[in-house]
Structure formats: C-alpha cells, structure tokens
Amino acid sequence: MNTHRDSTFAQLKWAQEKLGVSHLWQNTVSPMEMTYLPTKQKIIFRGFDDVLKIASTTVPKGYLNFVWIEEAFEISDEADFDKLDLSVPRGKIPEDLFKQTTVTFNPWSENHWLKKRFFDNTDENTATFSTNYLINEFLDETDRKIFEGMKKNNRRKYEVAGLGNWGIAEGLVYENWSVGRPEIPFDEEYKWKC
C-alpha cells in the first residue's frame, strides 16, 4: 500500500487541493480511502498483489462501478486482468451509471498484452487516449528540459516516455546497428581460402 500512498493517493489529494475541494473529502491512510463527504461515496485503494482478494472487494453504500489501475503495465498476465475486470465492478447498477475500468501506463514494450488488447484489437466498449509531455499541463520547465535532453541522448526512451509511442525503451544490447554490406577493404594479396 506504500506505493498507493506515494502515487495514486497522493495524486488525488493533490487534485483535491488544486481544484479547491479538499474540504469536501475525508482522506484516511488506514484503511487507505477517500470519502466524499456530501454523499459518503468512497475511493478505495488496493494493491494488485493477489487478484483474488481484489475480486471480492465491495462497498457498503452505493455502487462499485469505476476501477482505476495505475501502472497497468506491471500486470504481466492478461488472465489476472480479466479476473479483476469480470468481478470488479460487478452487479446491477442504475441505468444512469456505467461500469468503467481505466488503465494508465507508459507503453514500454510493443510486445505487451495491453497493446494487442486495447490498441490493436479494439471493440466498441473500448476507448483509448494517449498523452505525452508536450500536452501535460502539470509539467514545469525543469520537467520539459528532462524530456528535451532525453530526445537528444536516448531517442528510444524519449519516444516511449516522452511521446507515448509504443516501443522498447530499454534493454537491447545493440542500439546503433544496421544490416548491410560490410565496408571492409580487402587487398588482393589477402585471399580468402575455403
């Protein structure tokens, strides 16, 4: 849960302050949740360590119909995502509401199941949105300079982390190579013998 405290929980607390509505929320760390005081609706935070524990999550009031999975790229098994998506949110909800699972992530590998599922083979119930550092209103000049430096020094990482393009940002052994005829001059006195 420490990862939530330092990421999603902190982001939503920051948004409450930024929007000037923090007085409408009660935020607790144990259990980690946010309660919207006018309606008593809750935002609950859970880790993805055990998908079966999450699948049994429910709320005492209202409906559990929105799920946000931050850093969804860390879910390596699509079957685990399916278990969660098919069980939370669940149940009948009023007609003026809808069920939604939102996944946020950086597209670190074009071979990840997220690309195939949500970008290559979309259906009418899927909407995808891509953002990048150029349109991120929350970055300051220092942040932008980091991406500009990345653009010059690590183009592949810039394409993924900066521009939000699918790729493989890290881990290849040879980054600067091409296929072609070697440009090695051979003198006539050196003959290859087979």
Label each region the model flagged.
Residues K53-S56, K115-F118, R181-P185:
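Catalytic micro-motifs at enzyme active sites that drive phosphoryl/nucleotidyl and oxygen chemistry
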Residues Q26, M34-P38, F118-E124, E183-F186:
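Short, conserved catalytic or adaptor-binding loops enriched in Gly and charged residues
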